[in-house]
Amino acid sequence: MSSVGANIKKMAGNTLVYGLGNIFNRAITFLLLPLYINMMTPVEFGALNLIYPFLALMNVVYMYGLDAGFMRFFIPEKDQKRRQEIFSVVYLSILVSTAIITAALFLAEAPLSSLLLGDDPATSVFALAFIILMLDGLSFMPVLYYRSIQKPLRYVSIIFSEVVINLGLNVLLVGFWGWGLKGVLGANISSSLIKLLVASPAIFKNLNFTWNTRIWKDLLKFGLPTVPAVLFAMVVALGDRFLIKYFFDQATVGIYSAGYKIGMIMALMVTAFRFAWHPFFLSLSDQENARETFAKILTLFVIVGSFVFLLVSLLAPPVLTMDFNGKAIITPEYADGLRSVPLIL
């Protein structure tokens, strides 16, 4: 087999494994959608879909570009001690900043919840979102470490543990106990804690409590300029919920979000490809046949993506609204949200 073929095979294998990991992670969205739709009103479901975009934006702030800087300097580095030094600087920096940012969020809880949710009763559980941010901030780098050393199976095991706990607790807290939004956030806290514990071997293996200011400056010099672009991209991708709330109401946010989550099937494929692509691209960029390999991979990606778009656009509305013994995945109350599926795809 040629080196180009071997590289494509490696990329395809990693994409498949990362795809499984992201399918596990994103599958909870689809598996829990009928539960949320049947157990939560559009107003409450709308509140959930305003809180999660806020979490996504804040995750960027919690990382402030160190994730991009880490991959830039860690992956090409061959010396193990140097790699541990890079990991230590990144994790210690995030550890301190996470404590500071989380404390600031708790102090600003009242105005933030009022700005995001208005007078909605969900403001009473808004502080739970800050705990999720803290745990995700502490677990992000260990998970990224396994991506950076191209250990997709380890990555999938971490995501699988998180998803199983999250799914089980959602069924218990929301489905059986009827805790609604509080149950969703409580399940997320528990699953984020499990993710941190399962990923913690990467911390113990690499963290040595040494500090190198020069490495830290290099990481920030590379990573910080990426933050505005990432934030603006996320605002474009997630800001629609806030515009809908502003021009309409929170119930409309919930109805729209039901269709949006179906459209996120395409994001499963794109995210799986992107997760495998970054380490693969950096490790292959200095090879002679890199351009040919990249061209073939991207062509295949476009073909598969076009097929997924057509399949989901045509089949999602009739299948998801189909009546199964008086039940449907998307109930009539939320059916109007399916109009957005092709646009989201």
Roles of regions detected by a PLM:
Residues 1-30, 82-88, 122, 153, ...:
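N-terminal membrane topogenesis motif
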Residues 1-7, 11, 181, 197-237, ...:
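Interhelical loop/hinge segments that connect adjacent transmembrane helices in multipass membrane
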Residues 2, 70, 141-148, 152, ...:
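C-terminal transmembrane helix end/exit motif
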Residues 9-68, 98-106, 166-167, 224-250, ...:
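Signature of the first transmembrane helix
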Residues 29-44, 113-116, 234-265, 280-283, ...:
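Helix-terminus/linker motif at the lipid-water interface of multi-pass membrane proteins
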Residues 75-92, 255-345:
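Specific pore-lining/lateral-gate transmembrane helices of multi-pass inner-membrane transport
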Residues 103, 107, 118-141, 156-160, ...:
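Alpha-helical transmembrane segments of multi-pass membrane proteins
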Residues 123, 127, 156-204, 222:
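Hydrophobic alpha-helical transmembrane segments
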